[in-house]
């Protein structure tokens, strides 16, 4: 079971369909994945635009050779278009993980339905980084020398331009509610000037309690896994656990303190 941000909409859609009578949740994906019990549609492929986006990203790396490669930074320029007619039957459109090159933010205003946007990192409220790593420039429209890009003086206005472009796109959306899975992320979004006047709500990610529940025979399961009955066990996991953003490097330090 994946613990990445991309798995959250699958769990949510499944929970809504199973537990709320009369509600129908379907998924619109860039890359179609077959999931049992879920109705999934795919956005039309645009190979020429996809190729142009890849070349643009490559040029971005050439212009900014000092950019931190261990931290993601997404341009969101020439993002993927989509057919809004696919969403006309919906009462609410819920956006998940539209960062990077997946969606052209400037087209979101054409969706004539209330939008809910669940943020799984800080990308939506910055110029393009997914975690600020304690940089406070996102509170001032990312004006200044971005520590993640390490841009030469000629290109130091790129983050401010990206921030302004994204803010204009969000500002044109008639109805937009923001959701964060954690209180920390909610507070970070509130510190940004990306979403003035927008409602921000904290809602935890759903967990399938039919799957993740206390075991009926704990000792038998431990024995099957080779874990002593009285052992103290700490479980942790993430996609890219030792990415600086995920904090996996703190695990040995925590264990030393126990």
State where each predicted segment sits.
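Carbohydrate-associated surface elements
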Residues: 184, 206
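Conserved donor-binding/catalytic core segment of Leloir-type glycosyltransferases
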Residues: 227-246, 252-255
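Short N-terminal targeting/anchoring amphipathic segment
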Residues: 82-102, 114-120
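Short aromatic-enriched loop/helix-cap "lid" or pocket-rim segments at secondary-structure transitions
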Residues: 36-42, 107, 127-132, 137, ...
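Membrane-proximal helix-turn-helix segments that form the acceptor-binding/catalytic region
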Residues: 110, 123, 138-179, 187-198, ...
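A short helix/loop element that forms part of the nucleotide-sugar donor recognition site in Leloir-type
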Residues: 163, 213-227
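A short, charged, and often flexible helix/loop element on the N-terminal side
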Residues: 38-80, 150-158
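N-terminal subdomain of nucleotide-sugar transferases
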Residues: 1-42, 88, 111, 174, ...
């Amino acid at each position: 079971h994946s613990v990445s941000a991309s798995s959250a909409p699958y769990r949510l859609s499944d929970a809504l369909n199973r537990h709320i009578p009369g509600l129908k949740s379907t998924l619109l994906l860039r890359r179609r994945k077959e999931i049992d019990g879920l109705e999934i549609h795919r956005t039309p492929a645009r190979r020429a635009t996809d190729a142009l986006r890849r070349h643009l990203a490559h040029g971005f790396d050439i212009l900014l050779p000092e950019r931190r490669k261990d931290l993601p930074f997404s341009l969101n320029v020439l993002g993927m278009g989509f057919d809004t007619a696919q969403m006309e039957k919906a009462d609410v459109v819920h956006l998940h993980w539209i960062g990077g090159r997946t969606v052209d933010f400037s087209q979101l205003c054409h969706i004539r339905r209330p939008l809910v946007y669940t943020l799984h990192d800080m990308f939506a409220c910055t110029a393009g980084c997914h975690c600020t790593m304690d940089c406070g420039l996102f509170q001032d429209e990312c004006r200044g020398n971005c520590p993640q890009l390490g841009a030469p003086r000629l290109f130091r206005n790129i983050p401010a331009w990206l921030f302004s472009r994204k803010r204009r796109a969000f500002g044109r959306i008639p109805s937009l509610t923001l959701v964060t899975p954690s209180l920390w992320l909610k507070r970070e979004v509130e510190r940004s000037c990306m979403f003035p006047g927008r409602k921000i709500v904290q809602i935890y990610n759903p967990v399938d309690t039919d799957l993740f529940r206390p075991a009926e025979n704990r000792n038998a399961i431990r024995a099957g896994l080779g874990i002593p009955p009285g052992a103290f066990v700490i479980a942790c996991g993430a996609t890219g656990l030792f990415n600086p953003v995920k904090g996996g490097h703190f695990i040995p330090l925590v264990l030393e303190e126990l």
